[in-house]
């Protein structure tokens, strides 16, 4: 559940930080938290000569609001990260006030449909500042609200009726620094890549009675100063995705999953039903090749982890399993391709590729 990093082993110093959630222990200020861990990983990666960074927020369901503001501050000089508003109250702008920047180089953020809450805040802020390119699902989960929980057992003295349960209610909404809410709409990726859930209904918008999307006044912020032509980089990535046979197969798989899930009429005739099963089995086998995909990339742990791997077989096995997963990760592969574009050709000039 903690942040950790890895390095892609090739000519370019492209690094990856995986952040599974925005964790903090408010009862113990000296304990590990997401901000200090990410900051430490950045320092270690820079010591290895990092040229570009991928921050992986896929499946990150959120966490501490404080840590997301602090982590956002690692990538900008200073400024607002998110706005919060309660009913009948003025908006509150939460800002990074530290002028130091821990990483000012190329940054790509990976998201998916399960990136929610604090993950959306960070991705949205970096997108609004034009500080990072967001790659992933069509949109993130779309949870732009804050809930509080009241233990009803504490409300009733001398309760003899058993567990009274809890009462959960929404108290606030998050807003991007550009004024738009992340509620329902989430964060729309700059480069949309298909996955098996692309056409499946999920997210806050698919829950019962979700609060609507709205917008408020934008915060006062300044775009990140950079010579990078982000739109050209985004267009190049989109072109790669459009021409990728693997991405086409992933999209076909997603449409097939949607078709199967949407079917609600089944024939009672055995031969018709059996024919349908065989067709589904045949179609399913067409997508099995996706499991065998290899990017050709290799990943390695940082030097500080090597002694840990020697002394802890479980830790070593977990790292090796993660690296094997990254080698098959077509989305990570494209994120690293974008980093290469940003590093070698930030102004978006035409590239001439020489082949032997």
Regions found by a protein language model. Give the residues of each.
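Short, well-ordered junction/capping motifs at the entry into regular secondary structure
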Residues: 1-2
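Cleft-lining beta-strand/loop regions that shape enzyme active-site pockets
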Residues: 5-155, 324, 328, 340
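Flexible glycine-/small-residue-rich
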Residues: 18-21, 57, 111, 169-173, ...
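Low-complexity, polar-biased intrinsically disordered regions enriched in Pro/Ser/Thr/Gly
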Residues: 26-31, 151-164, 312-315, 319
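Short, functionally important structural connectors and interaction interfaces within domains
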Residues: 68, 73, 95, 141, ...
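Polar, glycine-rich mid-to-C-terminal structural blocks
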Residues: 130, 137-202
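Conserved functional hotspot residues or short segments at active or partner-binding sites
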Residues: 176-352
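Short, solvent-exposed mixed-charge patches
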Residues: 354-356
């Amino acid at each position: 559940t903690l942040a950790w990093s890895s390095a892609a082993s090739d000519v370019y110093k492209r690094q990856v930080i995986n952040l599974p959630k925005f964790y903090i222990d408010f009862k113990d200020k000296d304990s590990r938290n997401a901000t200090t861990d990410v900051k430490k990983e950045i320092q270690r990666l820079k010591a290895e000569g990092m040229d570009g960074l991928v921050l992986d927020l896929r499946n990150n369901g959120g966490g501490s609001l404080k840590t997301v503001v602090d982590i956002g501050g690692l990538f900008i000089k200073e400024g607002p990260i998110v706005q919060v508003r309660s009913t009948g109250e003025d908006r509150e702008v939460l800002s990074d006030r530290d002028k130091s920047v821990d990483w000012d180089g190329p940054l790509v953020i990976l998201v998916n449909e399960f990136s929610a809450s604090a993950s959306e805040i960070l991705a949205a802020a970096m997108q609004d500042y034009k500080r990072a390119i967001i790659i992933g699902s069509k949109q993130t989960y779309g949870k732009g609200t804050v809930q509080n929980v009241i233990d009803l057992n504490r409300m009733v003295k001398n309760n003899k009726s058993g567990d009274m349960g809890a009462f959960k209610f929404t108290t606030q909404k998050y807003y991007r620094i550009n004024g738009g809410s992340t509620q329902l709409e989430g964060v729309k990726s700059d480069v949309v890549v298909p996955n098996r859930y692309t056409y499946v209904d999920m997210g806050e918008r698919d829950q019962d009675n979700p609060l609507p999307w709205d917008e408020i006044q934008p915060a006062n912020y300044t775009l990140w100063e950079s010579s990078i032509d982000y739109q050209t980089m985004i267009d190049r990535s989109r072109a790669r995705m459009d021409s990728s046979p693997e991405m086409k197969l992933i999209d076909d798989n997603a449409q097939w999953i949607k078709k199967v899930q949407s079917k609600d009429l089944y024939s009672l005739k055995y031969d018709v039903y059996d024919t349908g099963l065989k067709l589904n089995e045949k179609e399913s086998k067409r997508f099995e090749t996706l499991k065998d995909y290899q990017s050709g990339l290799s990943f390695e742990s940082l030097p500080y982890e090597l002694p840990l791997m020697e002394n802890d077989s479980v830790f070593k096995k977990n790292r090796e399993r993660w690296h094997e997963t990254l080698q098959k990760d077509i989305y990570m592969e494209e994120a690293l391709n974008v980093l290469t574009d940003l590093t070698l050709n930030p102004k978006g000039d035409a590239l001439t590729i020489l082949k032997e």
